[in-house]
Curated annotation (Swiss-Prot):
Protein's name in the database: Uncharacterized ATP-binding protein MJ0075
Family per record: Belongs to the archaeal ATPase family.
Assigned keywords, A-Z: ATP-binding, Nucleotide-binding
Gene3D superfamilies per the UniProt record, alphabetical: P-loop containing nucleotide triphosphate hydrolases, Winged helix-like DNA-binding domain superfamily/Winged helix DNA-binding domain
Organism: Methanocaldococcus jannaschii (strain ATCC 43067 / DSM 2661 / JAL-1 / JCM 10045 / NBRC 100440)
InterPro entries linked: AAA+_ATPase, ATPase_dom, MJ1010-like_2nd, P-loop_NTPase, WH-like_DNA-bd_sf
Tagged with keyword Transcription: no
Record-linked CDD domains: AAA
Ligand binding (ATP): G31, P32, I33, N34, S35, G36, K37, T38
SUPFAM superfamilies: P-loop containing nucleoside triphosphate hydrolases (SSF52540)
GO molecular function: ATP binding; ATP hydrolysis activity
Length: 365
């Protein structure tokens, strides 16, 4: 079954508006886990498919192991033996011919840039004083001259976190992005992540003040979530849900697209709504319970502080960030229990399910 896309008109208009202008900023697309960031970018790519001027380079770092600088390049490029290219460059400048080659082979949507191995050898041998970013800059310049608009999208940016030399790579990568946007205005750059602490880290480290902007892709608000339920139930179940059923779903999973989708799929499999929701909640409660147990075993003092912090959410879904001491809030954000919105300065549970689990578990506290 092909997933149908729902709503997000405001975010889509904003991003299409940005793409229509000259590149001038790096954009961080952020929001809680499973809020629909990737799905939104896929929809954007889909809407651009008939517009011949865009060349989109989309890299999803999910599920790839990045332990070195060169792993990152392996993701950006697909290196292939290419005999035609060999013929082309017999006597000519490999780099110049390479640019022509990439222009020719760049499609609307590329997972990675295809590089003939002869060209890769030249680019990757830094001794020749030519590094990958400088080469790509030349490629993008040439594309611009021809009226093409390259777009780079990096999904799951936080995967760069595990890298030993990540500081270095992040500096190089974002210097490159600043050059492509603020300085040369030749390429749109978008980075997606649900890890707002990492986005903040990148922002500070790469000195992006005044050079980057943020677009929030949040879970749906209540009104939109109920409409999303109608949209999915008609499409997947072939029937409408009652108002009571929708309210019940919302009370358990809120407006998180992935959770709402999961509920509807389980309904299709013939399960009872109440059982589905109770099961999902139980799972979340168990996760949180074991997390708290581990913390308690390790450090009782920290455990007490965490319980105090989580207690604030018994009465509120969203609070001001500084209501929880920095080390505790960062710990809970890292553990994906809370979502920090560094722009608004707010904190909330990663999902309604997590919120409900907090309320259930801390009932006696
Ligand atoms: N606009 C939408 N229309 C239809 N379904 C959606 C939409 N947004 C999200 N979904 C559903 O929610 C799921 C999770 O969305 P997605 O993977 O895009 O989230 P994400 O924010 O990129 O996640 P992560 O936090 O892992 O980066 C999708 O697989 C899809 O089922």
């Amino acid at each position: 079954m092909i997933m149908k896309f729902f709503d997000r008109e405001r975010e889509i208009n904003e991003i299409l508006g940005i793409l229509d202008e000259t590149p001038d900023n790096i954009y961080f697309i952020y929001g809680p886990i499973n809020s629909g960031k990737t799905t939104l970018m896929m929809e954007i790519i889909n809407r651009l498919k008939d517009d011949k001027k865009y060349r989109i380079f989309y890299y999803n770092l999910r599920g790839v192991r990045i332990s070195s600088y060169s792993d990152f390049f392996d993701i950006m490029f697909e290196i292939r033996e290419d005999n035609k290219f060999k013929q082309m460059v017999k006597d000519a400048d490999v780099l110049v011919e390479g640019i022509k080659f990439i222009e020719k082979t760049a499609k609307l949507f590329n997972e990675s840039i295809i590089l003939p191995s002869d060209l890769a050898k030249v680019i990757l041998s830094k001794q020749k004083g030519f590094d990958v970013f400088r080469y790509l800059e030349r490629v993008f310049r040439e594309m611009n001259k021809k009226g093409l608009k390259p777009v780079i999208i990096i999904d799951e940016l936080q995967r760069l976190k595990g890298l030993k030399s990540n500081g270095e790579l992040i500096d190089d990568l974002f210097n490159f992005f600043v050059r492509l946007t603020k300085e040369l205005h030749i390429t749109h750059c978008f980075c997606l992540s649900s890890d707002s602490l990492f986005i903040e880290y990148v922002y500070d480290r790469a000195e992006l003040r005044g050079r980057a902007d943020y677009i929030l892709v949040d879970d749906f608000d209540k009104e939109t979530a109920l409409k999303f339920m109608d949209f999915l139930s008609e499409d997947i179940l072939g029937r409408k849900l009652s108002e009571d059923e929708k309210e019940l779903i919302y009370s358990y999973v809120g407006g998180k697209p992935k959770d709402v989708y999961d509920v509807i799929i389980k309904l299709k499999l013939g399960k009872e709504l109440k059982d589905i929701l109770e099961f999902m909640l139980k799972e979340e409660i168990q996760k949180l319970k074991y997390f708290l147990e581990d913390v308690k075993e390790d450090d009782e003092e920290l455990y007490n502080k965490i319980v105090d912090a989580l207690k604030i959410f018994k009465e509120n879904y969203e609070i001001e960030d500084i209501k929880i001491p920095k080390n505790i809030r960062e710990f809970l954000v890292k553990k994906n229990i809370l979502f920090l919105n560094p722009i608004e300065g707010t904190l909330k549970p990663q999902s309604f399910l997590v919120w409900n689990a907090i309320k259930k578990l801390l009932n006696g506290h």
